């Protein structure tokens, strides 16, 4: 059985026992989190939501919060001595999907 959930402006296809990385959630590590915005549930009896599946929930265990690898944004203009270097690290939350209920 799998489900498609929406979090952080993105959609994820998840199944039980899967670990996923999502945009940072405002919850403590080692707690459970429930996703209410379930777009679809698949398996032997698939269900599509309009826009969400009614009474469907995905429960996940919060493993940790972390930050991704640093990326460098470098802008320049040729022959003008314009250089601009900026770095960015995105925060994320690592989750373990424990249960999908319909």
From Swiss-Prot:
One of its GO terms (cellular component) is ribonucleoprotein complex. Keywords: Ribonucleoprotein, Ribosomal protein, RNA-binding, rRNA-binding. It comes from the Bacteria. One of its GO terms (biological process) is translation. The keyword Ribosomal protein applies. The keyword Magnesium does not apply. It holds the Pfam family Ribosomal_L21p. InterPro entries: bL21-like (IPR028909), bL21-like_sf (IPR036164), Ribosomal_bL21 (IPR001787), Ribosomal_bL21_CS (IPR018258). One of its GO terms (molecular function) is rRNA binding. This protein binds to 23S rRNA in the presence of protein L20. HAMAP family: Ribosomal_bL21. Part of the 50S ribosomal subunit. Contacts protein L20. Belongs to the bacterial ribosomal protein bL21 family. This is Large ribosomal subunit protein bL21. It comes from Aster yellows witches'-broom phytoplasma (strain AYWB). The gene is rplU.
